[in-house]
Each structure stands twice: as C-alpha cells, then as structure tokens.
Amino acid sequence: MNNNKLLFAPFANKRFITLIPNSKVVKPAIDDSTGTENLFNVEDLKTTTFNAIGEPSTMASLSVPPRIPLYIRRGCIVSLYNNKSSKDSNISMTHEWKSIIFNLFSYSSITSSLFIKLTSDKSFGLLVAPNFTSNIIPLLSKNSYSTLCTLNLNGSADWNIWGKNSIVAYEGNTSLNIVSNPLFNWRSVFKKRPIYSRKFQTIAGRGNVLLSGSGSIYTIELKTKEDEIVIKSECLLGISGSTQLEIKDSISEQKYISNDIIDQKPQPVLKDVKLSDLNKLTKEEYKIYFKDLYHLTSWWIKKTYIKWISGSTKFLKVKGPRNVLIQTGHNVYLPNIPTKKQETNLSVPEESLLTERDAQVKSEMKYTNYVTISRSGDVKFQSTPNFNETINKLKKN
C-alpha cells in the first residue's frame, strides 16, 4: 500500500500580474484615406452642379460658383463648405417667400413657400437633405420617407412638377424660371379642364433643380409617339413637354374599374311609401319595405366611402415622346431592378452527378480503412469503400 500523500496547492496555477503606471502616451496612427469620394469640388468651378448621394438618395451635394444665388427650402441645409481659397469669403443668407398664394390655396399651408437664399463672392458647397417641417411644433410634424433626384434643364423642354415638397433647391440664374400654375384663370372657364391635378409648378429654361419625392424616384423615357405608360395619378411626380398644350394632349385617363356602384342606384319595389302609411302595410309589404331600405342604405354607404373617404383611384395614360418622373409612394423604398430578364437554370446534368458521386466515393475510400495484422506482426493498411468484402473474407477464414 502506497502511503504517499497528495498535497494540494490551491494557488499553484494562479498568475499574478503587476500593473505599472506609465506617463507616456502613444498616439494612434491617423489614416487620411477614408475610402469615400470627395463630396465637394469647388475649385475652379464655372457652373453649378447638383449630385444626389447614397442609395437610396437621401442627401445631395451642391457646388455653386461665385455670385450665383442658390435657393433652398428652409430646414434642408445639412452643412456648408468652403475651401482654403474661399475661407475669407462671406456667405450671405436671407429668407424669401415663393408662391405663397399658390401653396396657401393648394395645400392650405405656406411652409413650402419659405426658401433660404445663399450668395457668395467665392465658390462654395453644401449638403442638402429633405428635412421638411410641416408643423410649427416639430414633434407634431409627420415626415414621410423621401428621396432626392436632380433635374438638369437644357432649355429643350419644360417640366410640370407636382407635390407640396417637390422642389427642394434650385439655382437662381436668369435663364431658369419656376412658375406656379394659376388655380383661377378666367380664360380656362370655357375650356375643357385637364384630367390631371392643376396643383403643379412649371420649370422652364436652363439650370439645375433638386427635387424630392415620396419613396423612391425613377425616370421613364418614352422615346416615340407609340410609347405609352399608365401611371397611378398619385405616383406622378413630373412630366416633360414642349408646351403646356402638348403636355395636356399627351395625358388621358385610363379607366379600369366602372362606377356601377355609384351610378346604379337601387330602385325600391314599393314606391311612394310615406312614413304615415307604414301602419297600413301588410306583413309581406313590411318585409319588402325594409329590404328596399337596407339596399338603399348599403348603396349610400358604399357611394360615400368610394367617392369621399377612399377616393376613386385614377390612372393616367401618358404618351411619348417625353420623360416621366414617378414616385413609389410614402414610406416605400424599392431597390434598383435589373432591366434585362435573367433566367437561372436549376437543372444539373446527369454527368456532373455521376462525377460528384465518383468523387465522393473516392473521398470516402481515403478515410475508410481496415488494418490486417499477421501472426508475424506485420501491419497492413488498406482503403475500402465499405467493409462488406472484408467481413466475407473473415467469415470464410
């Protein structure tokens, strides 16, 4: 019997580390490369440039040459930038009101009429985002998901733009004009009114404009007169054309759903029945009367909901040649979709399956082995796909 005792050392495996304070500070290395492109290019700038940033484009970079005024919606400026050569320049900022009467009667609000005018004797850049405030109290304002797009006009076509917050920024050169559509025009009293909304602004001339839309914004190019597209009226952001008459003639209403519910009023079986005559009705006439009353009430509720509460969905058919801007809608973002149809063949050739099976068998043979030990002590390793053959040999022996 072994009388040796085991002595446990509870602190044998512990390590003690001593921390010595050091007054030296090691500065981390600074990497000047951020891996992103420069947002501003204001050196030797001759023309105004607008660039949408990001995917989705929720911000825009604007570069402005000297002495060119820039108009931006109030609350949409994110940052201002000056380079070394223009750091001594002063950027003047003033408030200006645009189209107050139009916005007041169209949207019952004047917040979309307040713009900030920026001017400088040197070139500068700035970042802009669609930060709209529709209420005096910011906590009560409801901001929908919005993206930005740039519009560069060369004077060949005019643009009609719809929406309360569509125009975010534009350059104030002498060749760019933004005119609100007159809501009350005595000349159009005897003319046929257009089927689209009259709450639009016309942009004409040459220059850059920054637009905002609900959800994502896409451009559709209709190249020929035969090209046409049907758009939900709420999703139409802008449309181009040579004149207002040409734009008006290119848009027509496309009806998919008939107004049978609104137009076809149910006719009662019992006609000219007054409340004073109810006590004279028979039991069967009572049933018919209340059945007619039920159908009439149901029709009135459906008509009220479709016409006043829900609103009838209007589709507009637009003919080319022209460009159309569409927006996907509030709180919706759709990523870019490939234009070409891509088909994926999911079938696997039988030859490749056989090849894979053979490779799998060979791989299994590398790791499935049996060992034979002879009486003389020799050891022999052999690979095998399975042990059936080896078991049969052992049974025979």
From Swiss-Prot:
Domain of life the protein comes from: Eukaryota
Primary location group: mitochondrion
Keyword annotations of the record: Mitochondrion, Transit peptide
Identification of the protein by name: Altered inheritance of mitochondria protein 24, mitochondrial
Family, per entry: Belongs to the AIM24 family.
GO BP terms in the entry: inner mitochondrial membrane organization
InterPro entries: AIM24, AIM24_sf, Trp_RNA-bd_attenuator-like_dom
Transit peptide (residue range): 1-24
Keyword check for Transit peptide: yes
